[in-house]
Amino acid sequence: MPTQQCCVPRKHTFQLDELDRKLLDLLQDDAARPLYELGDLVGLSASAVQRRLSRYRSSGVIAKQIAVLDPDAVAGTVLACVLVMLERESKRLHADFRQRLLAASEVQQCYDLAGAWDYLVMVAANGMPRCRVVIDDLFLDAPNVKRYETLFIFEPIKRGLNIPLRQPDAVAKRRAASGGRR
């Protein structure tokens, strides 16, 4: 089973050229597109696309390719956002808390926050009873959790994991060329 990357900051960056940005934008929308189609869309051969994909994977730009399920299509899925405040601060206590989250398959995402709350945790569970058990197990009697607040999601307005890749100056140039229209 691959290691999950919950709340782990990245230490390096990858310099993207315009072809990289175009290709990665296409992949973020549909990673199952054939190489020849991706190549046609960005002006590269299928083998050149394959070389770039290999480079993205080896450098960590592409962390993994997965199938994203629609929670609405899977009967009984309950989504919740949990805000968590820790009692005490230390590297060890944060690491222990993060390990708890990494071990829970129902935790979809987690974010280390600045502000009143320490973490935002996204939970997906099969039904409300299971969601309550998961949240209670993770936070109710957890050592070092001072407070948590659960927000149940009625209706997702936008879902996505896409990272914006266009450079701000490119967007500004595009707007200027279109007469300022968005």
Describe each region flagged by the PLM:
Residues 1-182:
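A compositional/biophysical signature of low hydrophobicity enriched in polar/charged and small residues
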